[in-house]
Amino acid sequence: MLSPKKTKYRKQFKGRIHGTAKGGFTLNFGSYGLKSMEPERITARQIEAARRAITRQMKRQGRVWIRVFPDVPVTGKPAEVRMGSGKGSVEYWAARVHPGRIMFEIDGVPDDVAREALRLGAAKLPVKTRIVTRIDAAVEHA
């Protein structure tokens, strides 16, 4: 699973996800992409589950690019532990995803296979998504 090799600090504040994506909202690598339509924290496990679903549907043909990286440590305290005594330990890593962010890109497979693969990948994610293509992206930003 994805996680940073090294961080400046071990724990972070929770933070909020305000506004739309300031970058990463256009297709840069593949012909098809999966775009987030709402703000959410996506865990490393969810990213990996979506990646596996996409590659399985593509039957290991073509190429998949993961455009989000889980760099936010999420902490938690064990069950039935009293409040206080400091912040809990890091339990998992998450990525903050803004609306409009391209999360996955694929290329090298037919149109129907690409759309089905991204649909199955989207089912593993906790956000509403939209499948975008190179043609759609060109029309949007023209």
Swiss-Prot record:
A cellular component annotation (GO) from this entry: cytosolic large ribosomal subunit
Gene3D superfamilies from the UniProt entry: Ribosomal protein L10e/L16
Signal listed as a keyword: no
Taxonomy of the source species: Bacteria, Pseudomonadati, Pseudomonadota, Alphaproteobacteria, Caulobacterales
Subunit structure: Part of the 50S ribosomal subunit.
InterPro entries linked: Ribosomal_uL16, Ribosomal_uL16_bact-type, Ribosomal_uL16_CS, Ribosomal_uL16_dom, Ribosomal_uL16_sf
NCBIfam families tied to this protein: rplP_bact
GO biological process assignments: translation
Species of the source: Phenylobacterium zucineum (strain HLK1)
Pfam families for the chain: Ribosomal_L16
Keywords for the protein's UniProt record, in alphabetical order: Ribonucleoprotein, Ribosomal protein, RNA-binding, rRNA-binding, tRNA-binding
Superkingdom of origin: Bacteria
HAMAP family: Ribosomal_uL16
Assigned protein family: Belongs to the universal ribosomal protein uL16 family.
Name of the gene: rplP
Record keyword rRNA-binding present: yes
Function: Binds 23S rRNA and is also seen to make contacts with the A and possibly P site tRNAs.
GO MF term set: rRNA binding; structural constituent of ribosome; tRNA binding
The protein's name: Large ribosomal subunit protein uL16
